[in-house]
Each structure stands twice: as structure tokens, then as C-alpha cells.
């Protein structure tokens, strides 16, 4: 076939073909976009958009925190006004001698200045807020700790400081507890509060998974040089005393004693010792004998923590350890009247619930979940008998809602009074909820 007889075919250039395909695809996509989405599809799309927006927000927040940096945190702390003592006072000299006899004497002088407290409310996340601290003082607590404060957030974010640090003139003596693993950041955070509390505490005792992830609490204990540097930075840079809360180290007690002595000589003025290791959490007997050995080795006040369930346990703990104070946590959450010597009872818990709500009305917690968490513990035995009221309490959104539930609990208890079990039934208490087999105290320790 000659060239003159070839069919008259015009080839489409590649670019033109691609453009044509793209136009076809775009037309199809436009048609798809124009088609109305089903209700379920719209919900899926909205959910995806919401999740994406949240991811972007968190990403922006992380970037902002990185940009602030440690130096900016220090600058913000030093520039803080509004009555906060953020400057380094003349006696807050990092180069001064922090250990030795002079420090030991100053630690005891501080202890006497705050009244030599024997009954201490522990720092508890979302639980030792102002309303509950005031309630504990009402029943006899002589020293209270704030909930744990995250040093990085506290140093950098004004909103976090406002929401989580709630001092009051009547709430003294008060210790503000911080967690963290950076000396400069811890100091920056603590300088925001030093004018509004009596001491600053370093959390070296939290055994929870979140502390492992955040590298703080009891997960710092194996890093002796680090924890000593944290205490030294605080003691050398603040105008108020520095305290610390630790757990026992695994193995020989000499390891714990050695660490305690190092913290004392780094500037720690009061040491709280919990009588279990990080791994044990609350699952075994508290070793009061080990706490006693730490107390005997130190030259500063020591507070014992762990194993207190009943009022009589406080006396036993102090006698067994020789410590200067007893710190209460879980038992006080269920029965803050323990500070005044009252045992847990169904009848008493109704009155305690009302007393807490009165305090919460005067000093509202930052969220209703905090308020409800307290009532679930205080009313644990009654709510275990009246399950429907648990759901009603869970739906409460404010003090008035919660008070209505307390009224309903009281009415239900009265109606069931004839069939009620003994008020002192240990198996029914919140304290015993996770202690397998109801482990009972033995010599030298307590559950």
C-alpha cells in the first residue's frame, strides 16, 4: 500500500489524551460530589474531619510547647507578677551549703514553724483539691498537699496554673507537689508558688504507668544523680523549704537509706517514705519496719505513708516507725473523718458527703468529675447496696445534682435499715476493693 492510500487517521498527542482523561475524571468526580451523601456517609465524613482537626490541634500545641523551650519557661517564671514571689531571694543561693548540721537544724525549725503536724493529707491527682483539703482540715488534718502539678505545664501555661493551683488563706500549712525530670523547669514552675505555700515537694513516689511514660515519680529513683540534682536545684533556688516523697527501693534497705541520706544532704527538709516498692504499688503489706530504719538514719523530719485503714492504724504506724507524722491517702478519701478518729460507717458517710458538697459549693472543683469521684468513694458502701443510684450520681453535673443523689441515698438507707449489714463490714469498704483476700496487717506492716 502506497503512502497515498493510507487511511486518513489523526493521532491524538499524549498530552491531549491525558487532558481528555483528566477532564473525564473531573467530570465524574464533580458528578459524584454533586450526588447527595447518605446520612451514614455524612456522619462518617464529619467524624473524619473532627478527628483530623483534633490531630492538627494537638500537633500545633506540641509545636508551641517545643518553641517555648526551657529558657522561655524560666523567663516567664521570673517575670511573673500578680503577687507571686518569682525572684531569687537573697538566701536562695545555689552555692550555699545545703546539707550538714545547719540544714538539719533549719529543717526542724521549719517543722516547728508549721506546728509539728502529725496528721497529713497526701498529694492525690484530681483528689486533694481545695474543697477536699478544707474538708480534711475540718476533721483534723494538720498539713495538706496539693495534687501533683506537672512542672513543664505549670512553668509554661498560665491556664494550667490557674486551673490546678488553688491556694486559700485558710488552707495552711500547705505543700505544693511537682513532678518533673529537669532541674531548670522544676525551679521555674516552683517559683510561681513559693510565695503562696509553705514548702515545695518533689514527687518521687508515683508508681503508675503514666509516670513511667512521663519519666517522673518513682521511675526516677534508680537515677540517683538526677534526683539529687532536682532536689539541689529546688533547695538552692527557692525561698521555701523543699520536701520529697519516695518509695522503698527493691532489695536491701541500705539502698533506700543511702538515697534518703543523699536527698537530705542535697537540701531536702522533710522526707515522706511510702513503705512499698514501685513494683508493689498497693498490692501487699506496707513495710513499717523498713520505714523505721530510714527514719533512724536521717537527721530531718520524716513522714510515714502506707498501710493506714482505721484510726487506730495511725497510732500503730507512728509507734512502729518513730516518724514525725503520718500521711493518709486512700483511707482519707473514703473517710476523711479518720483524721478525727472516727471509723468508717454508712451513717457517718452520709454526713461526710454533705460536708464535702458544702465545701465544694464554696470552692468549686475544676470539673464535676472530681466532685463525683469523691462521692463515689465516700458513699461506696451505700452505693454498693443501691446500684441504681450509682448511675444517677454518674449523670450528676453540679453540686445540686449531687446533693439530690445524697438525699436519695439517705432515704434508701433508711428504708433498708432493718436489713442493713454491720456498718463495720471491712469487705464492703472502698479501701479494700483492690486488696485481694482482704490482707490483714501483720507485725511490722499493714495492708
Task: Give the location of each predicted region.
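Alpha/beta catalytic cores of nucleotide-metabolism and tRNA/nucleoside-modifying enzymes
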Residues: 1-120, 125, 130-131, 138, ...
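Glycine-rich, positively charged N-terminal anion/phosphate-binding segment
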Residues: 94-113, 124-193, 392
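Active-site beta-loop-alpha junctions enriched in small/polar residues
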Residues: 124-126, 149-151, 179-181, 205-207, ...
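Conserved radical SAM core fold
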Residues: 139, 149-155, 182-183, 204-218, ...
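Non-cysteine beta-strand/loop elements that form the S-adenosyl-L-methionine
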Residues: 146, 199-207, 265-276, 326-333
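Short glycine-enriched, charge-decorated loop/helix-capping segments at active-site entrances
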Residues: 161-163, 215-221, 280, 342-345
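Active-site beta->alpha loop and helix N-cap motifs at the rims of alpha/beta catalytic domains
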Residues: 171-242, 247-255, 264, 392
Amino acid at each position: 500500500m502506497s503512502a497515498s492510500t493510507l487511511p486518513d487517521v489523526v493521532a491524538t498527542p499524549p498530552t491531549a489524551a491525558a487532558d481528555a482523561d483528566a477532564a473525564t475524571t473531573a467530570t465524574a468526580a464533580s458528578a459524584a460530589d454533586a450526588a447527595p451523601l447518605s446520612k451514614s456517609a455524612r456522619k462518617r465524613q464529619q467524624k473524619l474531619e473532627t478527628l483530623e482537626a483534633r490531630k492538627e490541634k494537638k500537633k500545633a500545641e506540641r509545636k508551641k510547647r517545643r518553641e517555648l523551650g526551657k529558657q522561655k519557661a524560666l523567663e516567664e517564671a521570673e517575670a511573673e507578677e500578680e503577687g507571686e514571689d518569682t525572684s531569687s531571694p537573697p538566701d536562695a543561693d545555689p552555692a550555699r551549703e545545703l546539707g550538714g548540721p545547719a540544714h538539719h537544724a533549719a529543717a526542724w525549725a521549719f517543722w516547728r514553724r508549721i506546728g509539728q503536724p502529725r496528721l497529713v493529707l497526701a498529694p492525690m491527682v484530681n483528689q486533694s483539691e481545695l474543697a477536699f483539703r478544707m474538708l480534711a482540715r475540718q476533721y483534723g488534718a494538720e498539713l495538706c498537699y496539693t495534687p501533683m502539678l506537672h512542672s513543664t505545664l505549670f512553668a509554661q501555661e498560665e491556664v494550667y496554673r490557674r486551673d490546678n493551683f488553688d491556694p486559700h488563706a485558710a488552707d495552711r500549712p500547705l505543700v505544693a507537689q511537682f513532678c518533673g525530670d529537669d532541674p531548670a523547669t522544676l525551679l521555674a514552675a516552683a517559683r510561681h508558688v513559693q510565695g503562696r505555700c509553705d514548702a515545695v515537694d518533689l514527687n518521687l513516689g508515683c508508681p503508675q504507668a503514666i509516670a513511667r511514660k512521663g519519666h517522673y515519680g518513682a521511675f526516677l529513683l534508680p537515677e540517683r544523680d538526677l534526683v539529687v540534682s532536682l532536689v539541689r536545684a529546688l533547695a538552692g533556688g527557692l525561698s521555701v523549704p523543699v520536701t520529697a516523697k519516695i518509695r522503698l527501693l527493691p532489695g536491701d534497705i541500705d539502698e533506700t537509706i543511702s538515697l534518703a541520706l543523699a536527698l537530705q544532704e542535697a537540701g531536702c527538709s522533710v522526707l515522706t517514705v511510702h513503705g512499698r516498692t514501685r513494683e508493689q504499688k498497693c498490692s501487699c503489706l506496707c513495710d513499717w519496719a523498713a520505714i523505721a530504719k530510714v527514719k533512724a538514719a536521717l537527721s530531718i523530719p520524716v513522714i510515714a505513708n502506707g498501710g493506714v485503714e482505721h484510726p487506730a492504724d495511725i497510732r500503730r504506724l507512728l509507734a512502729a516507725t518513730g516518724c514525725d507524722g503520718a500521711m493518709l491517702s486512700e483511707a482519707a478519701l473514703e473517710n476523711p473523718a479518720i483524721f478525727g478518729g472516727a471509723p468508717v460507717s454508712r451513717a457517718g458517710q452520709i454526713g461526710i458527703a454533705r460536708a464535702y458538697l458544702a465545701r465544694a459549693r464554696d470552692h468549686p472543683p475544676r470539673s464535676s468529675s472530681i466532685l463525683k469521684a469523691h462521692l463515689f468513694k465516700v458513699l461506696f458502701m451505700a452505693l454498693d447496696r443501691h446500684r441504681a443510684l450509682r448511675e444517677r450520681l454518674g449523670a450528676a453535673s453540679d453540686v445540686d445534682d449531687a446533693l439530690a443523689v445524697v438525699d436519695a441515698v439517705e432515704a434508701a438507707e433508711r428504708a433498708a435499715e432493718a436489713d442493713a449489714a454491720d456498718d463495720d463490714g471491712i469487705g464492703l469498704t472502698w479501701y479494700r476493693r483492690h486488696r485481694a483476700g482482704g490482707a490483714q496487717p501483720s507485725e511490722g506492716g499493714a495492708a
